[in-house]
A protein has these predicted regions:
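Non-catalytic C-terminal interaction segments of nucleic acid-processing enzymes
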Residues: 1-20, 158, 168-174, 179-237
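Nuclease-adjacent, charged terminal/linker segments that flank catalytic cores
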Residues: 1-88
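Acidic-and-aromatic substrate-binding clefts and catalytic sites of carbohydrate-active enzymes
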Residues: 33-38, 123-125, 152-153, 184
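Acidic-basic catalytic patches of nuclease active cores, encompassing PD-(D/E)XK
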Residues: 80-123
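Active-site metal-binding core of divalent-cation-utilizing nuclease and nuclease-like domains
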Residues: 106-142, 150-152
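Short, basic/hydrophobic alpha-helical segments
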Residues: 135, 162-169
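Active-site-adjacent loop/helix micro-motif of nuclease/hydrolase catalytic cores
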Residues: 150-161
Length: 237
């Protein structure tokens, strides 16, 4: 494969990645490509000069945020006509850290056949839409949840039950929760191992309107090994 073909392949991967996640950084995109970011300056500059991407600094960060231009969005639809292109005009720091952490985790995974961002999953009928869905080479569907803060216990159980329902409807096979805090990890794992779980439902999809509705026996989820809980290092701005 010559240099032109290699760069064309890299450009396609970057455009699709940005369409899925909305934004990224040079170092994350380089990790995704499996190359050293230090040698990619000319390549990223060419993407900007070609009108495919734009780069801007966000206050409070050390790195430029890379997004698709409108022409870049059109390019993404050429690569994948059914792709829902995500675009943001503002970049709150918590949104950057959360998304970058998801992307960083994804770049470390081997044997990924396909993946779907939260934006793509919005078109599917998930009870509990995860942050990321990975399909591995064996066809196993793994939901990824990045928890950078401790949610209310009722909300945790509401999400747990949603995962169980999605598993029962064959939308997912497993869930991996990722935590920056070992204390929060231990708390979630403790809640998961309990039996029964308090059951919470909502009639309008709004978690602020959820109410207690009896209990649920999670033993089938425990036996299957539905959920796993791991410590990880979030992306550092």
């Amino acid at each position: 494969m010559n240099t032109f073909d290699i760069n064309a392949q890299k450009r396609e991967k970057i455009v699709i990645w940005l369409a899925k996640f909305g934004f990224s950084t040079r170092d994350l995109l380089s990790k995704m490509l499996g190359v050293n970011v230090d040698g990619q300056g000319a390549f990223f500059k060419k993407l900007v000069e070609s009108g495919i991407t734009k780069e801007e600094y966000v206050p409070g960060t050390r790195k430029r945020v890379i997004t698709l231009t409108p022409d870049g969005g059109q390019q993404a639809r050429i690569y994948q006509p059914d792709l829902e292109v995500k675009s943001l005009r503002k970049f709150p720091l918590h949104t950057l850290i959360h998304s970058y952490s998801i992307q960083s985790f994804l770049t470390t995974q081997k044997g990924v056949k396909d993946f779907f961002s939260e934006t793509e999953l919005a078109k599917r009928k998930f009870i509990r839409r995860p942050d990321l869905l990975i399909v591995n080479d064996a066809g196993v569907k793994i939901a990824i949840e990045v928890e950078l803060t401790q949610k209310d216990v009722n909300r945790v159980y509401f999400n747990f039950y949603g995962h169980v329902q999605d598993w029962q409807q064959e939308r997912i096979d497993h869930v991996i929760y990722l935590f920056s805090s070992p204390t929060v990890l231990a708390r979630y794992e403790e809640l998961y191992q309990k039996n029964p779980w308090p059951k919470f439902i909502t009639t309008d999809g709004n978690v602020r309107h959820m109410s207690r509705s009896g209990s649920v026996d999670p033993s089938h989820a425990h036996t299957h090994g539905l959920m796993y809980f791991h410590k990880f290092e979030p992306y550092a701005l």
